[in-house]
Amino acid sequence: MQLNDLRSAPGARREKLRPGRGIGSGLGKTGGRGHKGQTSRSGGKIAPGFEGGQQPLHRRLPKFGFTSLKALDRAEIRTSELAKVEGDVVTLQALKDANLVNQGVRRVKVMLSGDVGRAVTLKGIAVTKGARAAIEAAGGKIED
């Protein structure tokens, strides 16, 4: 006996239903589609979300929100993340090289969150009042 000689025992597997192929199948004549109406016809589907002429839910609810285009080229970083930048001078390009901000970012602001690990010099980067105090307390400076 080979693998290709193996067969299931008779009656072990149920035959596939073939709608519309005689009354003996249990799905003859209408083939399980019922009588008349849109869904009994071929191609008789209704669009997802269609509620029979009633105003659909997605049109009853109001629109809301928008995506600010300013958010696409601006970013915020924490004071604790400044330690991840190589060297003592932190510029926009240095932040991009350290993967702290995306490549498309054009403006960055440093927020006070965590401690500044070492003295760093910020060039061309905006800072909050608290972050400025923390950076200067650590011996760093901010240049515009």
UniProtKB/Swiss-Prot annotation:
Annotated GO biological process? translation
| HAMAP family from the UniProt entry | Ribosomal_uL15
Q: Which organism is it from?
A: Azotobacter vinelandii (strain DJ / ATCC BAA-1303)
The superkingdom listed in its UniProt entry is Bacteria
Which Gene Ontology molecular-function terms are recorded?
rRNA binding; structural constituent of ribosome
SUPFAM superfamilies tied to this protein = Ribosomal proteins L15p and L18e
Per the record, what is one GO cellular component? cytosolic large ribosomal subunit
Q: Supply the name of the protein.
A: Large ribosomal subunit protein uL15
Its taxonomic placement starts with:
Bacteria, Pseudomonadati, Pseudomonadota, Gammaproteobacteria, Pseudomonadales
Annotated PANTHER family: 50S RIBOSOMAL PROTEIN L15, LARGE RIBOSOMAL SUBUNIT PROTEIN UL15M
Q: Where is the composition biased (Gly residues)?
A: 21-31
**What is an example of a Pfam family matching this protein?**
Ribosomal_L27A
Q: Which UniProt keywords apply?
A: Ribonucleoprotein, Ribosomal protein, RNA-binding, rRNA-binding
| Subunit structure of this chain's protein | Part of the 50S ribosomal subunit.
Q: What does this protein do?
A: Binds to the 23S rRNA.
Database matches in InterPro entries: Ribosomal_uL15, Ribosomal_uL15/eL18, Ribosomal_uL15/eL18_sf, Ribosomal_uL15_bac-type, Ribosomal_uL15_CS
Q: Which family does the similarity line name? A: Belongs to the universal ribosomal protein uL15 family.
Q: Which gene encodes it?
A: rplO
- Ranges where the record places region Disordered: 1-58
